[in-house]
Amino acid sequence: MSSWENYNKVLGQMAAFGIELQKKDAGFPKKIGAKVTCGKGGKDFYKVYEFDRNGKTYLTGGFGTYRHGGTYQKIEVEWAPLSDEERNRQQAQRQAQIEAARARAAQEAELARSSAIDLWRKASPDGVSPYLERKGLRGESCRYLAKPITLRWPADRPGEQDTVVRLPEGTLVLPLIRYDFPKAEALRALQFIRPDGAKVYLKGFEKPGCALRLGDADHSPLVMVCEGYATGLSIRLGVDGQFPVFVAWDAGNLAHVVPLVRALYPDKRLLICADDDWKTFDKRTGRLNNPGRTTAKKVAKDVPGCDLVWPVFTVADRGDKDTDFDDLRKLEGLHVVRRQLTGLIRDMGRVYG
């Protein structure tokens, strides 16, 4: 039996929103006042607070998803009118929770950064990734695990089991970098891609603004931005390595990475190479929402000097998950990726000089 009056209503609101809590999400909420990743594939999140009122405790805050480019919804609570005294008490309580959560988040982010530095140093710059081999790609700006390692994160609550992740030899290691931070503080976390393709992030870091640059951007008139690492490698092949690519990791992070890249390179043209999530539907409405294109369009509109492209597939057997330029390369060939990208870049050169 939960200690929150509106516990089941909150779970119902999350389910109606489209969040499917998994076994790993047992014990909801795992934290109070801190953002917690949840749902299928870790694509959703929640951030809740506790409020005491008339001797009862309620959950407030909200939840959201990266699948919709960062869609967010507040928890709906039916409140009776508040007295000034009660309102002031609740505001003070929430502020205390916010400050405590910020302190915990800062501590966790620092632990993630320290772990990233240590594990990055231990990883080898030379190696083989079965994941990349299957895709026919060569790694760039990455490292490899020369021997297996085990990651362990303490349980959030007493009585729960620690999280244990085993990473075998051949795991690909990718740095998540804040390029606007001082060099000594730029590495924030790591993403591991195991030989079977499973992806694991270090726990506790803050993803917004983190990216990975493929290639040199200082002497290029054009900077490209995409979601995934394999997508970035295929784009680099498609332009024969002439232009750099920033990997933003997911659609939601484009809204943070693209403005950051614009600030770093104010005189360069930007090109977002979006995913075409042609079979992604909003679970709340049942409508096609295509977060890859939808988010990229908004970012391209909001950020000056930014253009947009997405892969155009012509094969009849395109799968539901064939969405990006890496999928296009595998289905239709590198020459198709090259034609679509270089043709647009030539047009941009004629328009913008």
Identify the residue ranges that each predicted region occupies.
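TOPRIM fold recognition
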Residues: 1-8, 220-221, 234-353
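Non-catalytic accessory segments of DNA primases and related replication-initiation nucleases
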Residues: 1-131, 277
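Short aromatic/hydrophobic-glycine micro-motifs
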Residues: 16-19, 137-140, 305-306
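A short acidic, often aromatic-flanked loop/helix-cap motif at beta-alpha or helix-coil junctions
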Residues: 28-32, 147-152, 313-324
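Residues that flank catalytic or metal-binding motifs in active/ligand-binding sites
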Residues: 61, 168-172, 321
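Extended, non-catalytic subsegments within catalytic or DNA/protein-binding/adaptor domains
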Residues: 73-169, 177-203
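Phosphate-handling DNA/RNA-contact segment within nucleic-acid enzymes
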Residues: 151-266
